[in-house]
Swiss-Prot record:
InterPro entries: PPP1R1A/B/C. The modification N-acetylmethionine is found at M1. This is Protein phosphatase 1 regulatory subunit 1A. The modification Phosphoserine is found at S43, S46, S47, S67. Residues 1-166 are annotated as: Disordered. Phosphorylation of Thr-35 is required for activity. The gene is PPP1R1A. The lineage of its organism: Eukaryota, Metazoa, Chordata, Craniata, Vertebrata. Residues 104-114 have a biased composition (Low complexity). Interacts with PPP1R15A. The keyword Phosphoprotein applies. The modification Phosphothreonine is found at T35. Inhibitor of protein-phosphatase 1. This protein may be important in hormonal control of glycogen metabolism. Does not inhibit type-2 phosphatases.
């Protein structure tokens, strides 16, 4: 149905000049050229001493070795207590080594994961142990908005439940 003179069909002709490489060498280069997936894996393995710092979450390292199709099939799950503890220990280890500035360390909330009375937490000494223990008790207004509740009504319903439970 389509004619050869159709405007949709574009044909290119390459002039036969002196080629820079013979066809076999060009084919070898094409075969050796890495795919984007292998580039990601080789760049991560290039310096093993920096590899741990480049990927802060040790739980993500096994997923990097998987193909994109395998990664797509994986479902994202919440971390278990053991995994969460491992992430907190890794974060605290980085803080002790001084890799993270003090201002950024206080903003992460990692100090709250330590039990009250543990020396070395600056936030606890300023706020007192009762302030850090009460902080996670009520959800943030943003979390309440995500669930469709208004922050003011959710707070009063929690207060009334707490009063009736006492």
């Amino acid at each position: 149905m389509e004619q050869d003179n159709s405007p949709r069909k574009i044909q290119f002709t390459v002039p036969l000049l002196e080629p820079h490489l013979d066809p076999e060498a060009a084919e070898q280069i094409r075969r050796r050229r890495p795919t984007p997936a292998t580039l990601v894996l080789t760049s991560d393995q290039s310096s093993p001493e920096v590899d741990e710092d480049r990927i802060p979450n040790p739980l993500l390292k096994p997923s990097l070795a998987m193909s994109p199709r395998q990664r797509k099939k994986m479902t994202r799950t919440t971390p278990t207590m053991k995994e969460l503890q491992m992430m907190v220990e890794h974060h605290l280890g980085q803080q002790e080594q001084g890799e993270e500035p003090e201002g950024a360390a206080e903003g992460t909330g990692a100090q709250e994961s330590q039990p009250p009375g543990t020396p070395g937490t600056g936030a606890e000494s300023r706020l007192g142990p009762s302030a850090t223990a009460q902080k996670p008790a009520q959800p943030s207004p943003r979390a309440q908005e995500r669930r469709g509740e208004e922050p003011s009504t959710a707070k009063t319903s929690q207060d009334s439940q707490g009063a009736s439970a006492v």
